[in-house]
């Protein structure tokens, strides 16, 4: 990437206490010289499904945002498997709400700790992470200026009720069988 120098960026791992007392890891990246004074814009990403661990990685589009003063946060919420199998179990089926509240609690903590201005927070997720975006838009709409939901999986019950849809029966372990 022309002009990219990794020395210009800082990565950080912080832990946020969720409303039920569980510690949720968050990976952050921002441009060197960033002032943690509560004025920056934040793009927070989440997935939290299928036991998929979301490892931090390089993205040229993220660098463009960092160069404009944004903070990027990857919330390692329950439903993934970053903290082991129980982390996954604690974010699926009847525990799915933990995925959503973890994400919201991460947002609250990052704003409170000065990583972002309360009115400059954007949330992003796709596919099953799109379900997360749908949930937070209903549970905490005032906390996000923008919510981007790519190819969202938002009608879980209807999908799980139709066994003729490809892959539906394979998804029962994640979402349950509503019949």
Segments and roles (model prediction):
Residues 1-38, 52, 56-63, 67-68, ...:
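Non-catalytic accessory segments flanking enzyme active sites
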Residues 33, 51-52, 80, 93:
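Short strand->helix junction
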Residues 38-40, 119-120:
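Short coil/turn segments at beta-strand junctions that form active-site/ligand-binding loops
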Residues 40, 46-52, 127:
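Active-site glycine-rich loops that stabilize anionic/oxyanionic intermediates
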Residues 40-41, 144:
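Local beta-strand N-terminus motif with an aromatic residue
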Residues 42, 66-76:
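A fold-wide structural signal in alpha/beta-hydrolase
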Residues 74-179:
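Active-site-proximal cap/loop segments of hydrolase catalytic domains
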């Amino acid at each position: 990437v022309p002009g990219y120098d990794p020395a210009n960026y800082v990565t950080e791992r912080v832990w946020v206490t969720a409303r039920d007392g569980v510690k949720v890891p968050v990976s952050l990246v921002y441009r060197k010289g960033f002032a943690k004074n509560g004025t920056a814009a934040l793009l927070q990403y989440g997935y939290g499904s299928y036991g998929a661990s979301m490892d931090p990685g390089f993205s040229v589009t993220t660098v463009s945002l960092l160069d404009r003063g944004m903070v990027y946060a990857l919330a390692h919420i329950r439903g993934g498997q970053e903290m082991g199998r129980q982390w996954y179990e604690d974010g699926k089926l009847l525990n799915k709400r933990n995925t959503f509240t973890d994400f919201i609690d991460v947002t609250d903590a990052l704003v409170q700790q000065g990583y972002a201005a309360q009115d400059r927070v954007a949330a992003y997720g796709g596919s099953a992470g799109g379900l997360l975006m749908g949930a937070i838009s209903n549970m905490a709409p005032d906390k996000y200026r923008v919510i981007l939901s790519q190819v969202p999986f938002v009608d879980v019950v209807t999908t799980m009720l139709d066994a003729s849809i490809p892959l539906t029966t394979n998804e029962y372990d994640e979402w349950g069988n509503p019949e």
